[in-house]
Amino acid sequence: MNDNELDNYIEAGRIAKTVLHKCAAEIKPGVGLAEIFEMVLDEISAAGVSHSFPPNISLNNCAAHDTASPDEERIFAEGDLVKLDIGTHIDGYIADTAVTVDLGDHASLCEASRAALDAAINVVAPEVVVSEIGAVVEETITSFGYKPIINLTGHALGRYSLHHGLSIPNTGKFGSAVLREDMVIAIEPFASTGSGLVHEAARAEIYQVIGNAPVRSPAGRKIMKKAEEMHGLPFARRWLNVPRAELALPALLRQGNLFLYHCLSDVPESFVSQFEHTIIVTADGALVTTR
């Protein structure tokens, strides 16, 4: 990794941290989910960098991939457990970070995922097998009396690439990949009061370009053009000001041009917490860009 790349990763992380904590502080009962969504984007833009995916704002048993819809009307309420997961990038060098805001009585659950993240970071070093990180996450979360979500993982980051091949498990039961110096990874433990497994819910608002098959409809071509402006990174349906988009999106999915991210949820009535940092693997261990 050259000095320019390192500087971009560090600055993207610094800004992501600042934006995350400023916006998380505004998550309160009575505040609209869309208000926080737009605040995150405004703060990232004001800092002079770009977002790397739509702000994920996931409530209660939903662990990941929820975000504001075009007609979003949800309001945070007393008792909610809100995961705010945001990303920035500078010239494609990404920071990905998340925090959980407790609007109820979930302090222990939040501490479980926060402590698991801290413990996992302490393990990071060249030649570490990723299952060793997962084992520490699992041990920490279970020590609090909760379950890690084992079918959600952290991930390697590349330039304009959020999921760059390598996964960082939240269990020690799998993962044979080995960390190397200069790898950039995001570790994100999820602790749950439920089953410890997520499923795809019906709700889905986030898309990503994955193909380039010919597109015939004008609406479809406009959507693909907007998506390509994201350099292949995910985008929200809320961002599409395209007539007939609701007809064009299913066609683009069928053609294999787009991928749709469904909300990932544990069982009803459960609660899930999440904390996340971006880390550069160094010769000495870990450089956390978002802390």
PLM segments and residue spans:
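Active-site neighborhoods and metal-handling regions in enzymes and metal-associated proteins
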Residues: 1-291
